[in-house]
C-alpha cells in the first residue's frame, strides 16, 4: 500500500489549440502518474460537464483555470492520503465531493484528470504497464482500428454531412499489419483526391476534408482508395460511418436536414437510406445514425439492420450506464462508444464497458476530436479486450500516439497478443 502525497493540475493545450487539464499524481514511494484530458467537438447533451472559465478575454472563453483550481485546492485535499491503488474509492470520493449528477460543480475535466493520473501512478507503483494494471493477466486483445480517413460534419469545414467515414482492416493478421493497411489506404486516398483536383487538407482527426457532392461520393472515393492500395473492400477492409445525426437533426420539424446534399429526411427515410448504403457498400458499423433523442427511430434502425451492422451509440448513450441500461432494455442499438470524458471517471468507464459486454453489446474505445499526446485509451482498449478502437487517421501526433502505444503493447504481449478481425463483431450474423 502506498499513499498519494501530491496531486497537481495545470492548464495545457489540446490538438485544436484549446486549453485542457493536465494532472500529476505522486505517491510516498516515489511513483508518478500524469494524464491529459480530451475534449469533444460534437457533444451529447447528456455528457458530463466540461468546466470552462467563460472569460472571453482569455482563450475565447475556453480557459480551464477554474477546473485546475478545483483540482489543486479542493480535490487534492480529498484525495491525498488515499491508497493509490484504491481506484474505486478515489473515484467515488470525487463523485461525492462534486455532488451533482453531471459533475458540473468541479468539472468532469478536473475529476477525470485525477482519476486517470491516479491509475497511471498505481501502475508505476506496481512496476507494470497501465494495460496490465487495469486488465490483469487477461488483457491481451489488440483492437481493430476504426480509422477516420475522410471527415465531414462538425469535424471539417466542407459540405459533407456525415461526420466520419472510416476504414476497418478486419482482414489483417495482427494490429501491426492493420495499422500498415490503414496508413497505405490513407496515402492512396490522398492520391485519389489529388487526381480529382480536390483539397487534401485534413480535419481535426487527421482525415481528409474535401468538398464532395454527396455522402455517397465519399464512400465511393474511399472504395477506390482501398482498391488502389491493393486491398479488397468487404474482405480485407470494411467501412464504418459516424453520422453524428444530432448535428443535422431539426428538433422543431423532427426531420434530418442534410444541407450538404440539400435533402431533408424523416427518421424512417434515414433508416431506408442506411439500408440502401449497407447493401451497396461493405459497411460494418454505423454510429449515431439517428438523433440522440430519436429512440423510436433508433428502435426501427435496430430492428431493420441490427443483425447485420454494428449500431453504435455515442451521443445516444454518452458512456453512461443509466442511459445504456435503458437502451439495452428497449433493444436500442447493439454497441456503445466509450469516451472517458463523457462520464468523467475511470471506474464509471469500466462499468459501462462491463455492462455492454454482459448484454451482448460491443464496446468501441474512442478518442475525442480535441486530443493530446496522452495514450491512456490504448491501454484501456487492451485491458478490457474491447476489440475496437476509434482514434482517428494514422496521421497527426495526437492520433498516432495511441497507435504507437498499441504497437508497443503488441510487442510486449508477444505471442500472447490476439487480433480478432471480423470476429470482433460477435453479435452480428456471420
Curated annotation (Swiss-Prot):
Keyword rRNA-binding among record annotations: no
Keyword Membrane: no
Superkingdom of origin organism: Bacteria
Cofactor annotation comment: Binds a second Mg(2+) ion via substrate during catalysis.
Positions of Mg(2+) binding: 242, 287, 314
Catalytic activity: (2R)-2-phosphoglycerate = phosphoenolpyruvate + H2O
GO biological process, any: glycolytic process
Pathway where this protein functions: Carbohydrate degradation; glycolysis; pyruvate from D-glyceraldehyde 3-phosphate: step 4/5
Active site: 205, 339
A Pfam family hit: Enolase_N
Protein location: Cytoplasm; Secreted; Cell surface
Names of the cofactor(s): Mg(2+)
Main subcellular location: cytoplasm
A single cellular component GO annotation: extracellular region
GO molecular function, a single term: phosphopyruvate hydratase activity
Binding site for (2R)-2-phosphoglycerate: 163, 339, 368-369, 390
Assigned EC number: 4.2.1.11
HAMAP family tied to this protein: Enolase
NCBIfam families noted in UniProt: eno
Family to which this protein belongs: Belongs to the enolase family.
Function noted in UniProt: Catalyzes the reversible conversion of 2-phosphoglycerate (2-PG) into phosphoenolpyruvate (PEP). It is essential for the degradation of carbohydrates via glycolysis. 'Moonlights' as a plasminogen receptor. Binds plasminogen when expressed on the bacterial cell surface, potentially allowing the bacterium to acquire surface-associated proteolytic activity, which in turn contributes to tissue invasion and virulence.
Protein name, entry field: Enolase
Recorded name of the encoding gene: eno
